[in-house]
Amino acid sequence: MFKSGFVTIVGRPNVGKSTLLNAIMKEKLSIVSCRPQTTRNNIQTILTEDNYQLVFVDTPGIHKPKHKLGEYMVKSASEAMKDVDLVLFLINPDEKPGRGDLFIIEQLKEVKVPVFLVLNKIDENPQEKVAETLKTYSELMEFEEIIPISALKGKNIDLLKELMFKYIPEGPQYYPEDMIIDQNERFIVAEIVREKALRLLSEEVPHGIAVEILQMKKNEKGTYHIEGNILCEKNSHKPIIIGKGGSKLKKISQYARQDIEAFLQSKVYIRLWVKVKEEWRDNQSLLKELGYKNMK
């Protein structure tokens, strides 16, 4: 008997959805940053084992949109809960249910498939706090399963996989067993660069950056030559991203190159520039060019 199913992970921004996905896959597939709303595009990630295949749709955190990109992110996350076989609602025990959580719960009540409540960061919170949070959420809605985990340390991840297998239906293998992600290499490379930029930049340059891959070529020796732009919205952001004497941009390139080489399993030469594109997050045509799907 072979089972297969589509799973979506939902939760407030910065709750650890990307970290959980990476822990399940044991791969660095989804951008991880300490800043909320860093996952911007639905990434279908595929986990194939001997007797099942799980297709994960990694979604942005649900939040009140402030621009076209924000509207897309919220719509994307909401639509991801439709036409799936299982929903994982990820929360942190150290935070009481806020407006965002209550908004998600109202949406989850309309879902016709099993919903798991997954408590992240249990290693960082006392058992009493975890138990209190469990009680609070259990009173808000009924969940098929409640699983405490530590995505960062991998605690109870195998248990979570076992329970997901239990609930998904019998079905075909949708993707080849060696395929782990349905996005192209350029998209992944851009996300890696963006993650490094978010980690290294100060709060003066929050989410108003994107990465545009201009060129990605592989020579006869197997080395990738990559060129790209880091897009920002304000002229004042440009020198911050570049840094004194180009130091910040150099660090972004160095750190990104290491992860890109691990991803492509090849030597990489990368060159980045910083370009100002005012209000790019409200530019629908540019958002489409940058890979944000279903923009209308």
From Swiss-Prot:
It is found in: Cytoplasm; Cell membrane. It is a peripheral membrane protein. The keyword Membrane applies. SUPFAM superfamilies: P-loop containing nucleoside triphosphate hydrolases, Prokaryotic type KH domain (KH-domain type II). Residues 58-61 are annotated as: G3. Gene3D superfamilies: 3.30.300.20, P-loop containing nucleotide triphosphate hydrolases. The keyword Amino-acid biosynthesis does not apply. Residues 37-41 are annotated as: G2. It comes from the Bacteria. Residues 201-278 form the KH type-2 domain. GO terms for biological process: ribosomal small subunit assembly. Coiled coil: none annotated. Residues 149-151 are annotated as: G5. Residues 11-18 are annotated as: G1. GTP binds at residues 11-18, 58-62, 120-123. GO terms for molecular function: GTP binding; GTPase activity; ribosomal small subunit binding; rRNA binding; small ribosomal subunit rRNA binding. NCBIfam families: era, PRK00089.1, small_GTP. Belongs to the TRAFAC class TrmE-Era-EngA-EngB-Septin-like GTPase superfamily. Era GTPase family. Monomer. An essential GTPase that binds both GDP and GTP, with rapid nucleotide exchange. Plays a role in 16S rRNA processing and 30S ribosomal subunit biogenesis and possibly also in cell cycle regulation and energy metabolism. This is GTPase Era. The lineage of its organism: Bacteria, Bacillati, Bacillota, Clostridia, Eubacteriales. The gene is era.
